[in-house]
């Protein structure tokens, strides 16, 4: 095998596997990120596994318990029409997580494709894609989503909401990926692939995307929290998930008016929203430090650990 062929084929598999193990070990040393990941997985499992085990469905009415506080029968209490708040909160958490992960996945795929194509091809293709990015960035995306999302009914409204949020959430990431691609296309392994007749699609999938995978993973993780907050804001204003379905945003909106007199209508959905966004951000920060140990957070954490023995010795 010649040196050029080795460059084109990329790093050997054992080296890539070793790097993955190193990143995983760095991530595990970040306790806040690990706690955030565990909490996020527990909420994800609970939102899907617990509802079938509950006595009451999220739409079922209990006319003997209207606006009752948390009890053994209704652990999170009931609302104005006797619906179980625990069942509704789990249903809302489930919908918000589905929307958050789906929007983050769609926006990351669109950003990876648009940014890598624009950066690799250049010329009029780059100009056209960046013109579209600039156009979408100046458009009032919140108003557009608010106008079109409620027009669909049932599960179609959630699907349309995911598509709209994902369609307006990829532009900034695409700019970042384009800049990275402009740098990578001048590297020796990309030039060698061109000389050997590799197609643009092969170069993107084999050489460009694997080298920016860490950035995509971090961006996707952080986008989950942003998408959940966006859906919550739309649902809070009545433009997101439509009745009879619920999300954390609709539960917060319906419980805000009674937050002081009947706090259980508001605090459980609000608490899960805060916890979900916090956990996704902790995981995203942990992944960033794991992939880029030279980042400011990682350096400051190492300095703190190095200062601990010195402080103990001085004491």
Question: What does each model-identified segment do?
Answer:
Residues 1-112, 116, 138, 142, ...:
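Gly/Trp-centered helix-boundary motif
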Residues 16, 59, 78, 121-124, ...:
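Residue-level signature of the cytosolic catalytic core of signaling kinases
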Residues 34, 95, 125-126, 141, ...:
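Residue-level recognition of membrane-helix boundary sites in multi-pass small-molecule transporters
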Residues 51-59, 120-127, 153-154, 177, ...:
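Transmembrane helix-loop junctions in multipass membrane proteins, especially transporters and channels
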Residues 137, 148-152, 165, 180-181, ...:
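Glycine-rich helix-loop "coupling/hinge" segments at transmembrane-helix boundaries
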Residues 75, 109-111, 119-187, 215-218:
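Generic hydrophobic transmembrane alpha-helix motif, especially the helices
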Residues 44, 48, 116-120, 147-151, ...:
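Alpha-helical transmembrane segments of multipass membrane proteins
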Residues 21, 83-98, 102, 122-130, ...:
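Amphipathic cytosolic juxtamembrane alpha-helices at the membrane-cytosol interface
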């Amino acid at each position: 095998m010649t040196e050029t062929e080795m460059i084109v084929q990329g790093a050997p598999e054992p080296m890539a596997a070793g790097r993955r193990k190193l990143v995983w070990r760095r991530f595990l040393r970040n306790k806040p990120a690990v706690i955030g990941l565990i909490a996020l997985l527990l909420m994800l499992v609970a939102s899907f596994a617990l509802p079938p085990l509950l006595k009451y469905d999220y739409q079922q009415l209990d006319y003997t318990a209207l606006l009752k506080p948390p009890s053994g029968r209704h652990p999170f209490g009931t609302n104005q029409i006797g619906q179980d708040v625990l069942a509704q909160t789990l249903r809302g958490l489930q919908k918000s997580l589905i929307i958050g992960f789906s929007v983050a996945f769609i926006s990351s795929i669109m950003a990876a494709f648009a940014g890598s194509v624009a950066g690799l091809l250049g010329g009029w293709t780059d100009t056209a894609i960046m013109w579209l990015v600039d156009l979408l960035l100046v458009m009032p995306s919140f108003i557009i989503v608010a106008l079109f999302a409620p027009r669909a009914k049932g599960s179609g409204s959630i699907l349309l909401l995911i598509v709209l949020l994902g369609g307006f959430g990829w532009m900034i990431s695409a700019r970042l990926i384009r800049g990275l691609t402009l740098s990578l296309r001048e590297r020796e392994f990309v030039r060698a692939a061109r000389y050997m007749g590799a197609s643009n699609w092969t170069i993107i999938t084999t050489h460009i995307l694997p080298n920016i995978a860490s950035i995509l993973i971090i961006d996707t993780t952080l986008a989950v929290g942003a998408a959940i907050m966006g859906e919550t804001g739309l649902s809070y204003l009545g433009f997101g998930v439509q009745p009879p379905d619920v999300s954390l945003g609709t539960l917060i909106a319906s419980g805000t008016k009674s937050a002081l007199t009947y706090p259980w209508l508001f605090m459980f959905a609000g608490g899960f929203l805060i916890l979900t966004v916090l956990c996704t951000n902790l995981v995203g920060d942990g992944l960033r430090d794991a992939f880029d140990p030279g980042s400011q957070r990682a350096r400051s954490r190492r300095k703190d650990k190095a200062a601990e023995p010195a402080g103990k010795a001085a004491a």
